[in-house]
Structure formats: C-alpha cells, structure tokens
C-alpha cells in the first residue's frame, strides 16, 4: 500500500494516471479572448474521486481553466480555444459536443451563493424538473439525498417550502451545492465557493468538500492557499496562463520543484 492522505485515500502519481483513474484529461489546451491568449499549452489529468485545487495569483487563468470543463466559456462571444479535454471516453471540446448534456455531467458552484427565488425544495429539484422528472417520490428522495450530502438536511427538513433567500449565506451556498449534485454529476466544479462566507460557514463548506469526493470528482479554484492545503489531495499552480507545477498537495506545498511555485506559496509574490 502506498502513502495515504489524511482521509485514507492512496496517493496517485498524477503524472502517470491510468484511464481508469482519470476523470478529466487536458491536452495542449490554449484559450483566447479575442486576440489575447489567456491559457497556454496546458496538459494535465484530474484523478477521479479526489479534490484537485487550482491556485495562482489573481488573473492567472485558473477560473478560466475551470470553466473549460463544462464549456461555460462558450457563453463569451470572443472566446475560442484549441486542444482537447476528455471526460472519461468523451472528447468534450469537440464542436459536436452536446453542451447541455455535458453540464449535467459536470456541475458548477460559483463564488457567491446564487439560489433561485424559489422554495428550498424547488431549488434542489430545479435541474431534475428540467430533465422531465415529475414523480413526486423521486423528487422527494432526491431532495433528501442531496440536502444530506450537502450537510443541510437537518437544518431545513422542516422548512422545505420556505423561500431559499431566508437562509443564511452559508446555508445558501450549501443549498446551491445540493442543487448541483441533485442531478448526480460526475464532476463538481467549485469556483472560490467560500470567498464570500464567514469563517464558520467556510469551515462547514471545507468539511463538506472532503466528503463530497466519495461520490464526485471535485475541482476547486481558491485564492486561499491554506484552504487548498486543508481540503485538496492534488494542487495545480497556474501562473500567467501556464501550468507551472502539479503534484499531490503535501509535496507541492512542502517540497515544490519549481522556484515560481516556492515564491508564490511563501508569499514572495502574488
């Protein structure tokens, strides 16, 4: 048996993952906003059922990279890319990709909680209703399952018909996570999910992230290096649109290979 992470998952060699170990594979990805290139020749693999953190200075391209995984950048008229991203056996950067179907497989949670102006219940089942699910028993089971997975069930089980805006910001963010996982995606993208929350809510979300990987592959963008160290199994350091270093989190933070990485994590710049 190899080395174990704090929650007893074997460390993988992320430079040589097998297909069975890989959730997302990025190969020579370049992305442009108009004539400006913002991602440069990025290649790496995201392991299944682990938390992978993307860190780097503001404007380095980490959120842009994250949005490539569910093609959110397609919503920008001047954005184009080349290279390849695979989700399992499917090339998701192909022009024929069904983007709506992709976003059912790759859920996303943003920086600020964005519940819909609906009840707690209707927030959770929103995606299922879009898929045509009407069976009340199926919907009820999905609500309980998702809210339990988001560590919110016991706080709201008697308030499901209340407007979601009556929840605290931390509860709203967990509700948004529940909404994302209700449709049972394979991958969950988290774009600075705690940056707008207080310390107690942040801790709750961090604890949640470490449990979510039992069912999902999690990719996390964070400006908080301490958070990356606490919750992620693997970390990629992005600088000026380039992947500088990618390794298991403990190794990257304690024994970085690249001087740029060391300078960033020790606060010399960024």
Swiss-Prot record:
Its EC number is 7.3.2.1. It is a peripheral membrane protein. Its main location: membrane. It catalyses: phosphate(out) + ATP + H2O = ADP + 2 phosphate(in) + H(+). It comes from the Bacteria. The complex is composed of two ATP-binding proteins (PstB), two transmembrane proteins (PstC and PstA) and a solute-binding protein (PstS). InterPro entries: AAA+_ATPase, ABC_transporter-like_ATP-bd, ABC_transporter-like_CS, P-loop_NTPase, PstB-like. Keywords: ATP-binding, Cell inner membrane, Cell membrane, Membrane, Nucleotide-binding, Phosphate transport, Translocase, Transport. GO terms for biological process: phosphate ion transmembrane transport. Signal peptide: none annotated. One of its GO terms (cellular component) is plasma membrane. It is found in: Cell inner membrane. It is an enzyme of class 7 (translocase). The keyword DNA damage does not apply. Part of the ABC transporter complex PstSACB involved in phosphate import. Responsible for energy coupling to the transport system. Belongs to the ABC transporter superfamily. Phosphate importer (TC 3.A.1.7) family. Residues 24-265 form the ABC transporter domain. This is Phosphate import ATP-binding protein PstB 1. NCBIfam families: 3a0107s01c2 (TIGR00972). One of its GO terms (molecular function) is ATP hydrolysis activity. ATP binds at residues 56-63.
